[in-house]
Amino acid sequence: MVATFNPAVGSHVWVEDPDEAWLDGEVVEINGDQIKVLCASGKQVVVKDSNIYPKDVEAPASGVEDMTRLAYLHEPGVLQNLQSRYDINEIYTYTGSILIAVNPFRRLPHLYSSHMMTQYKGASLGELSPHPFAVADAAYRQMVNEGVSQSILVSGESGAGKTESTKLLMRYLAFMGGRGAATEGRTVEQKVLESNPVLEAFGNAKTVKNNNSSRFGKFVEIQFDQSGRISGAAIRTYLLERSRVCQVSDPERNYHCFYMLCAAPEEDAKKFKLGDPKIYHYLNQSKCIQLDAMNDAEEYHATKKAMDVVGISSEEQDAIFRVVASILHLGNIEFAKGTEIDSSIPRDEKSWFHLKTAAELLMCNEKSLEDSLCKRIMATRDETITKTLDPEAALLSRDALAKVMYSRLFDWLVEKINTSIGQDPDSKYLIGVLDIYGFESFKTNSFEQFCINLTNEKLQQHFNQHVFKMEQEEYKKEEINWSYIEFVDNQDILDLIEKKPGGIIALLDEACMFPRSTHETFAQKLYQTYKNHKRFTKPKLARSDFTICHYAGDVTYQTELFLDKNKDYVIAEHQALLNASTCSFVANLFPPVSDDSKQSKFSSIGTRFKQQLVSLLEILNTTEPHYIRCIKPNNLLKPGIFENQNVLQQLRCGGVMEAIRISCAGYPTRKHFDEFLNRFGIIAPQVLDKNSNEPAACKKLLDKAGLEGYQIGKSKVFLRAGQMADLDTRRTEILGRSASIIQRKVRSYLAQKTFIQLRISATQIQAVCRGYLARSIYEGMRREAAALKIQRDLRKFLARKAYTELFSATILIQAGMRGMVSRKELCLRRQTKAATIIQTRCRVYLARLHYRKLKKAAITTQCAWRGKVARKELKNLKMAARETGALQEAKNKLEKQVEELTWRLQLEKRMRTDLEEAKKQENAKYESSLEEIQNKFKETEALLIKEREAAKTVSEVLPIIKEVPVVDQELMEKLTNENEKLKGMVSSLEIKIDETAKELHETARISQDRLKQALAAESKVAKLKTAMQRLEEKISDMETEKQIMLQQTILNTPVKSVAGHPPTATIKNLENGHRTNLENQFNEVEVNGNAGKSAAERQLENVDTLIDCVKENIGFSNGKPIAAFTIYKCLLHWKCFESEKTSAFDRLIEMIGSAIENEDDNGHLAYWLTNTSALLFLLQKSLKPAGAGATASKKPPITTSLFGRMALSFRSSPNLAAAAEAAALAVIRPVEAKYPALLFKQQLAAYVEKIFGMIRDNLKKELSALISMCIQAPRISKGGIQRSARSLGKDSPAIHWQSIIDGLNSLLAILKDNYVPLVLIQKIHTQTFSFVNVQLFNSLLLRKECCTFSNGEFVKSGLAELELWCGQVNEYAGPSWDELKHIRQAVGFLVIHQKYRVSYDDIVHDLCPILSVQQLYRICTLYWDDCYNTRSVSQEVISSMRALMTEESNDADSNSFLLDDNSSIPFSIDEISNSMHEKDFASVKPAKELLENPEFVFLH
């Protein structure tokens, strides 16, 4: 495969091994052409130098995505690369444009999600990781761009995954060419996809190698129109394995449909008279009845569902399953010898039962069915002869009938599917997907294997020609000189098989036409004809077998059944029987045979199949082919097992190794200039000159190495076979010499370093010793000086201490004397002050005691009166409460009671305040009168004392003065009378004071009772409020539920108008409790028919005027949108919110929808985003569902009660008047909204979300192109020849990152200029950064060349720029930076050094805590260090990740390593409401254009 190379000792090579195919090892000894190799397994082998191949030690551990990039393109290199990728679940690998798919035998749903299809859409082949989607996309793009039909050929042996790969291709083509929007009925692509389950049910079966093996070939033509949309399709099938219906080997199964029908629901099983599949002969020949991974009952329902999709009616489905059931019953008919010679009849009652059941299911005559199985009619010229069949012949007849019925049924299904799908006669382009059997070689190979291998021979020839063509195109593209490349042509094998006359098929047809021919005579004919043919041999000791040397190996065929299987005819009795069936479906399967066809020449399966192959190849030759080779890694059908020998054989059978051999025949090694110089620049470093370009440098290097025959292309170096190994050998020798030099230098450096350290150590020890001696002398001197200083300081301390004690004692004595004098003086002053205070407090106490008595009496009187009035009102309220009727009246009266009780409480509080004031005034009067009485009492008392003293004096003087004049006696009497009067007045005052005290006590008691009653009334008021609130909540819930039920039908169409609403609405009632003078004038007009029409027309004109004004950009006022504010004021004034029918909302919605038709104008969209969000905020604050806020929105009822009248006086107080004035100035008014208003609010919310999404998507679209340029660092070659390019490379990426920041700044400026709410700006940036995170992260995981150290540093520098921008606009960016967490952690992992020392816990908990195991595994396996050539994480870490992935393999979500872009709306209406305030709109001015219009006077 490659030329012999000259290995050196230490070279790494591959040696052949009978068990493992190839083993890697190291050359340890060379003796001429004998090479001793130490294998990695530990054993030593001696081989010839011609039997070893070089190994690329620098190949990445995870393999390469395209094997043409391998340094050595040979069998062991290819095998090792596939195994390395298979071990890390990378099951797809390119070989040029050929995709190799290794069956993982496990579910990998993350590889086939819709998100993955989106990733591959439009990506160039090789740009992303290998995938069937990439092949399908390349075919689709080539068809659309070049106008050339395409074909995708999927091949491989049974169990390799051909069917699944075909499904993926068809799914992706349906994704690319689908119609998108739903159409009536099923689309073409849906029918094409759903045809797979139907064909699998009737054409797939379990074989030894595969549980779901396709036993037929399939070519699906998907037709496209000029725009690239699927317009039609056709399915062509080849060579159904009919013999499987009657003969099943253990442990295989028959076709799936038989087992599905047996597992059908009980009613279907009874209808078809079916039971356990083990009782049917056609099924119980094998012990395998049930498959572990397949539920036949579920598959039955899935198949019926697929039949519905592809257009098979329920009647046709019933007929199909009746035919299938009849075949099972036919198989259980056994025959015994009849009464006549060589005749037969059904053996027993069981056979008769199955015969009868089969006849019933086929709707034919039971006797006719028996005759068709047991008899033959021979027609001669004169008469018709009936011939009986013996039991053995009857069994063969039975099996022939079963096989032909199933074959016709399968053909009908294919034809029905094609008819249902429909072909486009005008289609010019198609993409064909070929799913056909791979090369087969078993112990027993019959006619089916012969036809299958013929197919593979034809396809292999087509494949070789395509590969050769690709090689030529590659050479032409690189403009190199090339000569004709020889490759193995299998035309001689094809001539051997299909040449006419003289080919094997022609001889087989000839043998079939002779009645007496047997397989032995046919074999002898083959032996005679091809005894000298190099591709044909006769096995030893074989009488009827023959061997053909195919391209993939020798295959021995057994001819026993060749003749029977090649005959393509239907027994006449079977044809007549089924054509006469009363079931139209069965009769149509066997239409009457025309006379022309009866007289036509012999037709065979082989010839017909050969014609089908010719037709297929004609189609393929008119298309551009693409190849997918499916590989089965092991025969155990288990994951994680890679059998080298098995895979190698399949690579050979699939033609992959032949393609590699063709590549090796020319220039097998192709390296880009930079890769070549980076790898081999060490051979001739002097050629890496600053002034040299890459091609010249490569040429100089190759000339320096003395190689010849190479070619320098436009972008690559093309090397002959073996030249890469020679270069690697020289490189290894140079590296070895360099290693020796490095080792010598290192040893010299280490010895020198040791000597220097010893010398430094000796010097340091000497310095330490000298220092120690010097420090000892210095320490003695310090101690002597210190002793002298201590003595001096001690003497000074003792003297100072004696003086300080004497000084302190003197001061202490003086302080004690002065303190004693001061304390005596302080004590005297305290006594004087205390006496004064006691006198003052005593006088105050006496005065206060008298005042409290008077105040208590006054309060008692007031409380008694208030209690009387309150009880009277409470009694009236109770009577009114007992008279309540309906729920609404109860609610209104409760509201009235609550208000009255509220006002009563307020009045009570006010009365308490007034009474307090009256108390104070009365107390003041009482105090003043009391003082007067006390003064009079004191004066009277003083007079009495004087009188008593005068009387005493008189009594003392009386004995002396005997004679008193008359005048003195009269004066005495007057004084006595006056004294008596004063005494009486004093006693009456004392009585009056006692009565007043009693009344005060009684009043206090009554006041306490009244207070209790007032508290009880207040508690009752609270309870009534609670009850009323509950009633309101119930009513509100009922109304809200009603509104929600009405609105559910329009939730998904917020932009459309409400059906059923007329364009105009009749104004029934314009009163809402807040009428202006202008409204009063309008409502006073008599509403008759003509006046109503005029008002409606005026309303429509006003709405038109409003829309004409606000549909233009009328700007902002104080940072708030004028249009939104104007619309809200107009709708509020026109009472549209309270109207049951209005067209204003529909007109506004239409206006907004037409205003945002230009989806690319971010400025215009931002303007309307601000307006719609502001208007939504105003509606959110204003609108209340009907009945939910009736109490708050209604005007307080006018009351004539005492408390109501008194409350009116309270409303006119200064504080309440100011509050009313502030409420009048409020912009937002609560309104009880009707259904149209609530619908308008929902539609407005939908438009806010829609405009937000449009702006966000525009930004994403702008950034998408830039992100793709920011993910991969520019490649920089080794040496100076790229220095100028490096300097440009540093600036070029920065331009793309700066362009992203410029795009963000541009949009931010637009949003700020249009005053978009801050919360929406933050959400836009948050979702945009999340999009950037998803795109960068997914690109990193899908492109191996991105998972490098240098690329990590490159992306990290770009992320730093974004972080700086987020810091600069932190207010508007919000938490956007946190959205980049995945790419930040992934890049952080790429740029850390010494990854092999990092443990799994360190990665999961410290480096990348947010990443899943699948994502970490993907990064670790793809990573390669392009700067320092260090290793990735250790194998233990990889094993830990793989174990965890195996545990989570059943979870589809956990298996996905890609991120999904979240396009949902990330905010709610409440967030918008919380970001604004009502006061922000207080200073907003309406549109100036409307202020001049007399109809909009209310805007002033």
Curated annotation (Swiss-Prot):
Region (Actin-binding): 496-530, 532-555, 590-613, 613-635
Gene3D superfamilies from the UniProt entry: 1.10.10.820, 1.20.5.190, 1.20.58.530, 6.20.240.20, Kinesin motor domain (3.40.850.10), Myosin S1 fragment, N-terminal (2.30.30.360), Myosin VI head, motor domain, U50 subdomain (1.20.120.720)
Domain spans labelled Dilute: 1146-1447
Residues engaged in binding ATP: 156-163, 210-218
Ranges in coiled-coil conformation: 884-1049
UniProt GO MF annotations: actin filament binding; ATP binding; calmodulin binding; cytoskeletal motor activity
Any one of the GO BP annotations: actin filament organization
SMART domains hit by this protein: DIL, IQ, MYSc
Keywords, comma-separated and alphabetical: Actin-binding, ATP-binding, Calmodulin-binding, Coiled coil, Cytoplasm, Motor protein, Myosin, Nucleotide-binding, Repeat
Annotated Myosin N-terminal SH3-like domain residues: 8-57
Subcellular localization: Cytoplasm
Null allele phenotype: No visible phenotype.
Ranges where the Myosin motor domain occurs: 62-732
Domain IQ, chain residue ranges per copy: 735-764, 758-787, 783-812, 806-835, 831-860, 854-883
Gene Ontology, cellular component aspect: cytoplasm; myosin complex
UniProt-listed InterPro entries: Dilute_dom (IPR002710), IQ_motif_EF-hand-BS (IPR000048), Kinesin_motor_dom_sf (IPR036961), Myosin_head_motor_dom-like (IPR001609), Myosin_N (IPR004009), Myosin_S1_N (IPR008989), MyosinXI_CBD (IPR037975), MYSc_Myo11 (IPR036018)
Main location: cytoplasm
Job description of the protein: Myosin heavy chain that is required for the cell cycle-regulated transport of various organelles and proteins for their segregation. Functions by binding with its tail domain to receptor proteins on organelles and exerting force with its N-terminal motor domain against actin filaments, thereby transporting its cargo along polarized actin cables.
Domain remark in the UniProt entry: IQ domain mediates interaction with calmodulin. The tail domain is a globular cargo-binding domain.
Family per similarity comment: Belongs to the TRAFAC class myosin-kinesin ATPase superfamily. Myosin family. Plant myosin class XI subfamily.
Quaternary organization: Homodimer.
Protein name: Myosin-8
Native organism: Arabidopsis thaliana (Mouse-ear cress)
Gene coding for it: XI-B
